[in-house]
Design a protein with these regions (language model features):
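Short, structurally constrained coil/turn elements
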Residues: 29-31, 69
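Proline-aspartate-enriched helix->loop->beta-strand connector
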Residues: 1, 31-32
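Catalytic His-Asp segment of secreted/periplasmic serine-dependent ester chemistry enzymes
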Residues: 42-136
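Conserved, well-ordered alpha-helix/loop/beta-strand core segments that scaffold catalytic motifs
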Residues: 19-23, 27, 34-39, 43, ...
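Oxyanion-hole/transition-state-stabilizing segment in secreted/luminal serine hydrolases
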Residues: 1-14, 42-43
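Alpha-helix N-cap and loop-to-helix initiation/capping positions
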Residues: 10-18, 52-59
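Amphipathic, non-transmembrane alpha-helical secondary structure
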Residues: 13-20, 24, 112, 116, ...
């Protein structure tokens, strides 16, 4: 995971540009390929005596969204779907826990929960697509 190693907005933008180049390379190999980028989950680190979301996380997500949109790819925001800032802390406190006490990884139940959220969004978007397709 790159989040702990990205320390500035400039590095986040550079990471997003690198990611964009990787998508473009794959599209060059297969121009018909479609991509769905899944953004990173919330993750936290200790600051003084409390756990907080990595401060650079939102910048990295923004850079990845830009890379996705600039390459006509789709983007699913896992961070936002979890609940945003400090949500990993809430997920770890649930019973049963949805996130490990490292505040980075999901438990098996948490992985199923995030998968369910993703599938729900995907199916809703597909339903909207079919409705709009039939109207046109």
């Amino acid at each position: 995971n790159t989040i702990p190693y990205i320390k500035s907005k400039e590095r986040a933008i550079k990471y997003g540009n690198y990611f964009k180049k990787q998508i473009l390379k794959l599209k060059k190999i297969n121009p018909k390929a479609m991509f769905l980028i899944i953004g990173p989950a919330d993750m936290a680190k200790k600051q003084k005596t409390e756990m907080i979301t990595y401060p650079i996380l939102v910048e990295v997500i923004s850079a990845l969204k830009n890379a996705a949109f600039e390459t006509n790819s789709c983007f699913w925001d896992m961070y936002l779907n979890m609940g945003g800032e400090n949500s990993i802390i809430d997920w770890s406190k649930k019973t049963p826990s949805l996130a490990a006490r490292d505040y980075i990884h999901f438990t098996n139940k948490g992985a199923r929960e995030i998968a369910d959220l993703f599938i729900e969004d995907l199916m809703n978007d597909f339903k909207n697509y079919l409705e709009n397709k039939n109207e046109n």
